Amino acid sequence: MVMEKLGDSLQGALKKLIGAGRIDERTVNEVVKDIQRALLQADVNVKLVMGMSQRIKERAMKEDPPAGMNPREHVIRIVYQELMEIIGKGADIQLKPQTIMMVGLQGSGKTTSAAKLARYFQRKGLKAGVVAADTFRPGAYHQLKTLSEKLNVGFYGEEGNPDAVEITIHGLKALEKYDIKIVDTAGRHALEADLIEEMERIHAVAKPDHKFMVLDAGIGQQASQQAHAFNDSVGITGVIITKLDGTAKGGGALSAVSETKAPIAFIGVGETPEDFEKFEADRFISRLLGMGDLKSLMEKAEESLSEEDVNVEALMQGRFTLKDMYKQLEAMNKMGPLKQIMSMLPMGMGGLGGVKLSDEMFQATSDKMKNYKVIMDSMTEDEMADPKLIGGSRIKRISRGSGCSPEDVRELLKYHKTMQTALKGFRGGKFNIQKMMKKKMGM
């Protein structure tokens, strides 16, 4: 999960609140102290943290809970709202034809983000392409070309041409029929006069709808200075924060950018194209607090899965064969790493009320799922359609064919039976996602 350490610390503070006998001033002070510690360790500005802490204490003691909400839920709601205040709202990204100019310092992940951004829009049904206008950094052309080919997005570049403005003009002409045109500009080690001049010249010919500044989350609170400097020089409409998965200073970067009033547009949370998300503060904070993000999970499923992947009608009628389970495992694999999917589930399903799994346990579970697919590849069509056919002799045959032990085959059959029982429970109305979404935080 993004900023896992901060999320664990915040969830630990809320668990203390949930486990308290009664919500009094002492309990609130203890919880606030834990939240303070978590935010300061994430490099959030001290002044912001102290201001937020004071507001949580005052509101928790003075405000009456809204109708239908108990004191515990009310305090959690206050924490949620105050975190929203210091993180800020995301940028308004519309799915329509537009030109985007990428700016930022060298090493921020700008070129990679340009390709991932194109892929993001392409997944949303828009034709996207990139223009390689970074003529300053050796290798920038080849890097963007390779990434574009890998992600199957449009590309335009002129290897050896040192004129970034000319390349931009030619590139936008070449990508004229594309919905989304992204211009990757050069970075520097500092915001120098020649960089500003080049960006202004590119801006004049590109006439971009958006100028996104790319920042490395590892710089923490320094993000504020960079965002201010770029905004004053060329004006920015949004910020992309990269490498949020690999630093303890992500909270500092997020809150510092918010303080500049420059909206956060996207966040990079890993190496793959799927680890690039539109930033939505409410969803982000929900995941941090262990409340899940079912909306993002559903969107990810819609983008990744086809009707052939999951036969919803059959599942809801209680029909769940090994063939269905095989498709389900393949579908989960398309949606991304198991750990990332689990972080989107609310408390009691992987969040606050769930069991905390280590990286090793997630890996072991993923390996087991792959093993199950190997075992099922050694079964006949009849066996996949009706697991009751699989007796002792068939288990031995499947075991030999898959290279797995008979115990592994039996474990798979037991897992299938458990899943079948669980789905019958869902069918009976014990699991109502819509109801859960409406109840969540009373919002």
Swiss-Prot record:
Q: What biological-process GO terms show up in the record?
A: SRP-dependent cotranslational protein targeting to membrane
Q: Which GO terms describe its molecular function?
A: 7S RNA binding; ATP hydrolysis activity; GTP binding; GTPase activity
Report the EC number(s), separated by commas if there are several. Answer: 3.6.5.4
Record keywords, A-Z: Cytoplasm, GTP-binding, Hydrolase, Nucleotide-binding, Ribonucleoprotein, RNA-binding, Signal recognition particle
Matching entries from CDD domains are given as: SRP54_G
Q: What is its main location?
A: cytoplasm
Annotated residues for binding of GTP: 104-111, 184-188, 242-245
Domain notes for this protein: Composed of three domains: the N-terminal N domain, which is responsible for interactions with the ribosome, the central G domain, which binds GTP, and the C-terminal M domain, which binds the RNA and the signal sequence of the RNC.
Please state which protein family the record places this protein in.
Answer: Belongs to the GTP-binding SRP family. SRP54 subfamily.
Q: Name one Pfam family in it.
A: SRP54_N
What's the source species' lineage?
Archaea, Methanobacteriati, Methanobacteriota, Stenosarchaea group, Methanomicrobia
Per UniProt, subcellular location reads as: Cytoplasm
Q: What does this protein do?
A: Involved in targeting and insertion of nascent membrane proteins into the cytoplasmic membrane. Binds to the hydrophobic signal sequence of the ribosome-nascent chain (RNC) as it emerges from the ribosomes. The SRP-RNC complex is then targeted to the cytoplasmic membrane where it interacts with the SRP receptor FtsY.
- Gene coding for it: srp54
Gene3D superfamilies xref list: P-loop containing nucleotide triphosphate hydrolases, Signal recognition particle SRP54, nucleotide-binding domain, Signal recognition particle, SRP54 subunit, M-domain
Keyword GTP-binding included in the entry's annotation: yes
Task: Name one cellular component (GO) term.
Answer: signal recognition particle
This chain belongs to the protein called Signal recognition particle 54 kDa protein
Specify the species: Methanosarcina mazei (strain ATCC BAA-159 / DSM 3647 / Goe1 / Go1 / JCM 11833 / OCM 88)
Residue runs in coiled coils: none
Question: What is catalyzed by this enzyme?
Answer: GTP + H2O = GDP + phosphate + H(+)
Quaternary structure annotation from Swiss-Prot or TrEMBL = Part of the signal recognition particle protein translocation system, which is composed of SRP and FtsY. Archaeal SRP consists of a 7S RNA molecule of 300 nucleotides and two protein subunits: SRP54 and SRP19.
Taxonomy, superkingdom:
Archaea
